[in-house]
Design a protein with these regions (language model features):
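Amphipathic, Lys/Arg-enriched alpha-helical "gate/interface" segment within cytosolic domains
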Residues: 1-135
Length: 135
């Protein structure tokens, strides 16, 4: 129970955060301020983040947008997309609200997806667009 984090693939281009059962905003802050920057600092290339809320009990929604904004603004320059997976209607509403309120590089890089498979496809769209720009 809580939050676990691991590399989703051997290439270290995607980090999977799994929110399972109960967790706290303190757990979230530890993850986003310590663990995530360390992992993302291991590699020079773009890293996408899949945050799986499928089996999560969300703590109080008070301050959720502020917590998310501070977390994302602290990620390294190699941060690609954040894709929130399997969230309930409240989580999906918060993702959409976040995208509208922070309509800049942070909001434009944040998405919701119903499954990990769809989230992976969204991450690959970023990579395809980046490759096309590099050619």
């Amino acid at each position: 129970m809580g939050i676990s984090v691991e590399w989703y693939n051997e290439e270290k281009t995607i980090i999977l955060q799994t929110y399972d059962g109960r967790w706290t905003w303190e757990d979230f802050q530890d993850l986003t301020r310590v663990i995530m920057p360390k992992m993302m600092g291991e590699v020079p290339h773009t890293v996408h983040i899949l945050s799986d809320f499928t089996n999560s009990d969300i703590p109080s929604m008070n301050g959720a947008l502020t917590h998310a904004k501070h977390a994302l603004s602290g990620y390294g320059d190699n941060w690609g997309y954040l894709i929130v997976v399997g969230g309930n209607s409240m989580v999906n509403m918060l993702v959409n609200l976040f995208r509208q309120l922070f309509n800049n590089s942070v909001g434009n890089k944040t998405f919701a997806a119903p499954t990990l498979e769809v989230a992976f496809d969204i991450a690959m769209q970023y990579d395809d667009a980046y490759e096309a720009m590099s050619e």
